[in-house]
C-alpha cells in the first residue's frame, strides 16, 4: 500500500486551480499600455463591495479577475454570479474555481434582489457557473432570481449570461419563459480552438442555443462575445460573426484575452486597438444592432449604457422598415 501525504501545512491556502496543476507553466506576456487600468480604491467602490458582502453574494468581477472592476464598482455596477463560486467545467481561459459545487443557496434569489435594490441598479447582469451536476443545469434557479428582482425592483431591466445547458432538456425554454430583457451566452472563441480553450462545450450547440432563444421569443435581445489573442485568425473571427448573424444575434462583444495565471492558456498576442476598430466596423456592416469591440471589452462592461443603445438601435431599425 502506498500512502500519499498532503504536503500542505495545516491551515495553508489550497491552490485555486488544482485541476490545472499538472499543466506546464505558460509564458506571461507584458501588457501593452492600452491594457493597463487604475487600481480600484474609491469610496463608492468600497460601498459596492460592502453591499456584495452583506448579501453573501459572489461576483464574476472578482472571481474572473476582471480588469474593469475598479471602473464598474465605482459606478455601483456589479455582475452577480449565482449558484456558487465553483464550476463543474475547467475551461483553460477562466479564473473561476473548478470542483464539486455546494448545494444551491435557497436564500440567494432574495439576496440578489436585495443587493440590486440597495445598489439602485437600472440594469443588472446575472451570470453563473456551469452546474452540470444539477438536473436542469440551474435553469429553475435563474428563473427564481429573475422573479425575485422583478418583485423588488420592477423598473430594473435584467440581462442574463448563461451556461450552455448542454444535455439539459427543457432548461433553455424554462429560462426564456422568464423573459429576461437580454439573453447572453458567449461563444468565447473560434471553433478550431474549442478543444483546448473550452473543452467541455460545443461551438454549434452554443450557437444553436442562441438561435433557439430568438425562435421562442423574438422580442428578447440576444448577445454573445468572443475573446481574441488566443491564436485565432482574422478570417476565423469574421466567420464567427457570420455564424452569429445567421443565428440572429443582436449584440456582439469582442475583447482581449488576458491570462489569469501561468497554468492557463497562453496569450498568443495582444490585438491592437486599431484591429478592434476594424472588427467593430466589419461587424456593424454585417447587421448586428450593437457591437462593442476593444481591448478591455467584457460581456457586462458598460451593460447599462449598452442596453439603452440596443433598444434605440432596434427602434431605429424598425422605423426604417
From Swiss-Prot:
A cellular component term, taken from the record's GO annotations: cytoplasm
Cellular compartments annotated: Cytoplasm
Repeat listed as a keyword: no
Cofactor(s) named in the record: [4Fe-4S] cluster
Pathway: Protein modification; protein lipoylation via endogenous pathway; protein N(6)-(lipoyl)lysine from octanoyl-[acyl-carrier-protein]: step 2/2
Binding site for [4Fe-4S] cluster 1: 61, 66, 72, 300
SMART domains: Elp3 (SM00729)
Binding annotation for [4Fe-4S] cluster 2: 87, 91, 94
Cofactor binding: number and manner: Binds 2 [4Fe-4S] clusters per subunit. One cluster is coordinated with 3 cysteines and an exchangeable S-adenosyl-L-methionine.
Domain of life of the native organism: Bacteria
GO MF term (any one): 4 iron, 4 sulfur cluster binding
Region (Disordered): 1-26
UniProt main location, coarse: cytoplasm
InterPro entries per the UniProt record, alphabetical: Aldolase_TIM, Elp3/MiaA/NifB-like_rSAM, LIAS_N, Lipoyl_synth, rSAM
Catalyses which reaction(s): [[Fe-S] cluster scaffold protein carrying a second [4Fe-4S](2+) cluster] + N(6)-octanoyl-L-lysyl-[protein] + 2 oxidized [2Fe-2S]-[ferredoxin] + 2 S-adenosyl-L-methionine + 4 H(+) = [[Fe-S] cluster scaffold protein] + N(6)-[(R)-dihydrolipoyl]-L-lysyl-[protein] + 4 Fe(3+) + 2 hydrogen sulfide + 2 5'-deoxyadenosine + 2 L-methionine + 2 reduced [2Fe-2S]-[ferredoxin]
Chain intervals with Basic and acidic residues compositional bias: 16-26
Transmembrane segments: none
Enzyme nomenclature, EC number: 2.8.1.8
Keywords: 4Fe-4S, Cytoplasm, Iron, Iron-sulfur, Metal-binding, S-adenosyl-L-methionine, Transferase
HAMAP family per the UniProt record, alphabetical: Lipoyl_synth (MF_00206)
UniProt name for this protein: Lipoyl synthase
Organism in which the protein naturally occurs: Parvibaculum lavamentivorans (strain DS-1 / DSM 13023 / NCIMB 13966)
Gene that this sequence comes from: lipA
Amino acid at each position: 500500500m502506498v500512502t500519499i501525504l498532503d504536503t500542505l501545512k495545516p491551515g495553508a491556502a489550497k491552490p485555486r486551480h488544482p485541476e490545472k496543476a499538472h499543466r506546464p507553466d505558460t509564458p506571461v506576456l507584458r501588457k501593452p499600455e492600452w491594457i493597463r487600468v487604475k487600481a480600484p480604491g474609491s469610496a463608492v467602490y468600497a460601498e459596492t463591495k460592502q453591499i456584495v458582502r452583506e448579501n453573501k453574494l459572489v461576483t464574476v468581477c472578482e472571481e474572473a479577475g476582471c480588469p474593469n472592476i475598479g471602473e464598474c464598482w465605482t459606478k455601483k455596477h456589479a455582475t452577480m454570479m449565482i449558484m456558487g463560486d465553483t464550476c463543474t467545467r475547467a475551461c483553460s481561459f477562466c479564473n473561476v474555481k473548478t470542483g464539486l459545487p455546494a448545494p444551491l443557496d435557497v436564500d440567494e434569489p432574495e439576496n440578489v434582489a436585495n443587493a440590486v435594490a440597495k445598489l439602485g441598479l437600472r440594469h443588472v447582469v446575472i451570470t453563473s457557473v456551469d452546474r452540470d451536476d444539477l438536473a436542469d443545469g440551474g435553469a429553475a434557479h435563474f428563473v427564481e432570481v429573475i422573479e425575485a428582482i422583478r418583485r423588488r425592483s420592477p423598473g430594473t431591466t435584467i440581462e442574463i449570461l448563461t451556461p450552455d445547458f448542454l444535455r439539459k432538456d427543457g432548461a433553455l425554454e424554462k429560462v426564456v419563459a422568464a423573459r429576461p430583457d437580454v439573453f447572453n451566452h458567449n461563444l468565447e472563441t473560434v471553433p478550431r480552438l474549442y478543444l483546448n480553450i473550452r473543452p467541455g462545450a460545443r461551438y454549434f450547440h452554443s450557437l444553436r442555443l442562441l438561435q433557439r432563444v430568438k425562435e421562442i421569443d423574438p422580442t428578447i435581445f440576444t448577445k454573445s462575445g468572443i475573446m481574441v489573442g488566443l491564436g485565432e485568425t482574422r478570417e476565423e473571427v469574421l466567420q464567427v460573426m457570420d455564424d452569429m448573424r445567421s443565428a440572429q444575434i443582436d449584440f456582439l462583444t469582442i475583447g482581449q484575452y488576458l491570462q489569469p495565471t501561468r497554468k492557463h492558456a497562453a496569450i498568443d498576442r495582444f490585438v491592437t486597438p486599431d484591429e478592434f476598430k476594424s472588427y467593430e466596423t466589419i461587424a456593424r456592416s454585417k447587421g448586428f444592432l450593437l457591437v462593442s469591440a476593444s481591448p478591455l471589452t467584457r460581456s457586462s462592461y458598460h451593460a447599462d449604457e449598452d442596453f439603452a443603445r440596443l433598444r434605440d438601435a432596434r427602434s431605429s431599425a424598425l422605423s426604417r422598415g
